């Protein structure tokens, strides 16, 4: 049974306020039937030094990725994961994590690949919860299996792949590419991208024609999302009706921007190219541009 929506007034201006919850809303409902909380961090060990009471850990690297192929787990493995974590198909799942929900948004996105209908993000993530000095726990909960069904992953409308991104470069009116990495990564000065990802590449730069919109500009210093007016200004150069594809280094930061565009601003046609620069920058004879962004210089600070 789905949990009620958070009526927090600031969320009403977003396109899909049902996809985001506040710390106060979640704190009042921890342990409620039909509500499961998932912590998913860039630093997986943070869970061990204190987490939301009743929250389970999903490690993006170990739990969501196929151990052999560079791809996500299949429906059978996802169902097994859900059953280990005690998550039912009709549960409301609230995901949170460190670094302004960087990897939490990625985990939410993977849930959506398997069609889990009610997945929400905790505004501000782990840092906001801790900053408000809310309850934490060291107890790792054990839940009974919820008999989660095997549902095969559906990539269509959520993922973009290298062949179609490459093909769009020669098409008139093709996809709008948004590079959500830092300006130094986009320009090619930092060819290795995020230094914590351990994902070096052979070439630096960006996909030709891409717009650089750093994912972190969408959040405030405390990790909370900016207001609708600020986000509209930040993404003013994008058309919600266009085929929009976001990318970063390995798809993690892009998932955060995907969430902003889809659920906070109401973009209907936004996908994540999760192969991202780790794939593009290592492939032979791929077109690459370097240099600073010239298409969008909006500041909302």
UniProtKB/Swiss-Prot annotation:
Alphabetic keyword roster: Repeat, Transferase
Residues at which substrate binds: 253
Active site: 248
Cited InterPro entries: Rhodanese-like_dom, Rhodanese-like_dom_sf, Thiosulfate_sulfurtransferase, Thiosulphate_STrfase_CS
Leading EC class: transferase
Keyword Lyase listed: no
Pfam families registered for this protein in UniProt: Rhodanese (PF00581)
Domain Rhodanese: 31-138, 171-289
Domain of life: Bacteria
Name of protein: Thiosulfate sulfurtransferase
Organism: Corynebacterium glutamicum (strain ATCC 13032 / DSM 20300 / JCM 1318 / BCRC 11384 / CCUG 27702 / LMG 3730 / NBRC 12168 / NCIMB 10025 / NRRL B-2784 / 534)
